[in-house]
Amino acid sequence: MATRGGGGGGGGKEAKGKVMGPLFPRLHVNDAAKGGGPRAPPRNKMALYEQFTVPSHRFSGGGGGGGVGGSPAHSTSAASQSQSQSQVYGRDSSLFQPFNVPSNRPGHSTEKINSDKINKKISGSRKELGMLSSQTKGMDIYASRSTAEAPQRRAENTIKSSSGKRLADDDEFMVPSVFNSRFPQYSTQENAGVQDQSTPLVAANPHKSPSTVSKSSTKCYNTVSKKLERIHVSDVKSRTPLKDKEMEAAQTSKNVEVEKSSSFHASKDMFESRHAKVYPKMDKTGIINDSDEPHGGNSGHQATSRNGGSMKFQNPPMRRNEISSNPSSENTDRHYNLPQGGIEETGTKRKRLLEQHDAEKSDDVSRLLEQHDAENIDDVSDSSVECITGWEISPDKIVGAIGTKHFWKARRAIMNQQRVFAVQVFELHKLVKVQKLIAASPHVLIESDPCLGNALLGSKNKLVEENLKAQPLLVATIDDVEPSLQQPEVSKENTEDSPPSPHDTGLGSGQRDQAATNGVSKSNRRATPVASDNKQNNWGVQLQPPQNQWLVPVMSPLEGLVYKPYSGPCPPAGSILAPFYANCTPLSLPSTAGDFMNSAYGVPMPHQPQHMGAPGPPSMPMNYFPPFSIPVMNPTAPAPVVEQGRHPSMPQPYGNFEQQSWISCNMSHPSGIWRFHASRDSEAQASSASSPFDRFQCSGSGPVSAFPTVSAQNNQPQPSYSSRDNQTNVIKVVPHNSRTASESAARIFRSIQMERQRDD
């Protein structure tokens, strides 16, 4: 059991070695005979409960004790009562319990914590009176070993060894006092020598106290304030040398000196940070209205006080964050010194320290504020929010607030919107998936051959087998021209040596019409004259030419949007064309193709003026033809009008074409190709270039034979393709690749949404 002592300063040596033994103070009846001693404890449990819980009975025996000239009997009575109270509750507690030291047991109520703080402040006030009275006599607290201070120091050592683990449980409320013994529970939270200021007793008021202060407590407070005013002058004079001695003794005795109420800030910070949920209103009820107290759990940094001041350190080299990082070294250097000085002197010194250390600590304050600002705001918000009863919103409460009609109306609107949103998300995901599949699988589109049906393949193969023999013709090079639509069938009479007769120029008109309506046409030879190959591939195999293949999207009324292969160095622009196939049988029309033009395709035979002549150089210079269309020229028949990109579709009878004048190409290898446009749906499909009327560029670079003889062609065979045409590249014309498929789907989705909005 710890040694107990009183707070009086009269008979110090007599009370120095007194040891308080038994549980009840009635054993010390001699003290009661001297006056002011505790009365005999009650004999029933209810009286015991009232004595230790009701504030009016708590200090009844020692209300006038603690004065400057208090007798040892008063000190003994106060010590005995404190001892009995602590022992009744089953633990050994020091006489002067640290004010506002949080207990490790988190189960206290707000009122009990507040009462504990009130009574601890009362004990601290009585203790301060004893110490201050000894200071006026010039006594050294460590050298004289006075009766009032020796048990106090032992009690403080006990507090240090236990690390502030004990907190009185027998108090209900607290009344703020002038001075408070504030001992830090956690040594890592505060540095030695922190200066703080307490508010006067007048400004302090208990917040939401369950009961009023007893008469004895009020009398004790009046005595405290009178004594403080009386000894204020002498205390200021004796404060400085005593403080120096205490600082020296702190290093030898391994105790930390705390100036006035310095440790209370650290304990309050840790207490609020750990127990903000248990005590959400502690900032109002459990803490005095101190001008330097930060609001709501500001731990680990210098916070701005309520009146604009700032907490300052007495030891400038030491920083609070450095102390927190070195808790072991600070544990051994702590010495508890009771607060000294009056209210006015404390405020003056605080202001002076504020001015001295403002420049030194400005950087630290700003840095620490930045580091802990978010955490502190969270602490404050937690404390303020959790003190309010949480709202439990249920559908019934909403119905009661807005009414049944509005509730069901809002519910239906929300459900409908969620349903629409679910459908939209499904459509968007489907669009993204389809776009990625289309963009990532061009080979599937080629192999599946979407442009040709099974029925069409059969008829095309028959047509090709009947026309395996073909006549080579001159075709423009890749640099200047590009393949376009040709007539879908090859006439039987196109042989190598002699031009056939007009009646052998091709198949029946029915077959031609069928091929024209199906939109299937053969691609032309884009090379100089070569001999025909009797082992030409059929239509199904001719999808892989040694050229670039472009998968062009074609919108068909029967098939919808399909990708059809198109061979050529450049994709068609503008209108959508029928499919193109390379490596087909070359087309060569005889010189007597007038009847063929009229009978087979129904093209009215135009006048044959200067453009129709014998094989040789043309009578007019070659006209440059745009690279997206190749003129097909017949030595004897006029070329049909070439449908260009500006005329995407011209409804015509089967095989009807507009006719233009002869269009020649200014190129190194003179050639001519007869070009026909046959539509699947009775339409003349257009090529992808602009009209040739806009591209007439006459050049007189010399006569070039546009109608060479067959023998000259056969005698001078040339490679059918240039060097850069030997490689085959499959290029798919798609809106976006697989990487941007989601963007395309998003645009489609937005267009769908806009259409729905317009419909609504």
From Swiss-Prot:
Keywords: Flowering, Nucleus, Transcription, Transcription regulation. InterPro entries: ELF3-like. Disruption phenotype: Late flowering phenotype under short day (SD) and long day (LD) conditions. It is found in: Nucleus. Residues 1-120, 144-169, 236-262, 285-346, 485-543, 707-760 are annotated as: Disordered. GO terms for cellular component: nucleus. It comes from the Eukaryota. Induction: Circadian-regulation under short day (SD) conditions. Expression increases after midnight, peaks just at dawn and gradually decreases during the daytime. This is Protein HEADING DATE 3B. It comes from Oryza sativa subsp. japonica (Rice). GO terms for biological process: flower development; positive regulation of long-day photoperiodism, flowering; positive regulation of short-day photoperiodism, flowering. Residues 108-120, 236-248 have a biased composition (Basic and acidic residues). Transmembrane segments: none annotated. Residues 94-107, 511-522, 531-543, 707-730 have a biased composition (Polar residues). Residues 71-87 have a biased composition (Low complexity). Involved in the regulation of flowering time under short day (SD) and long day (LD) conditions. Functions as a floral promoter by negatively regulating GHD7, a repressor of the photoperiodic control of flowering. Acts as a floral activator in the LD photoperiodic pathway. Involved in blue light-induced activation of EHD1 expression to promote flowering under SD conditions. Residues 1-12, 60-70 have a biased composition (Gly residues).
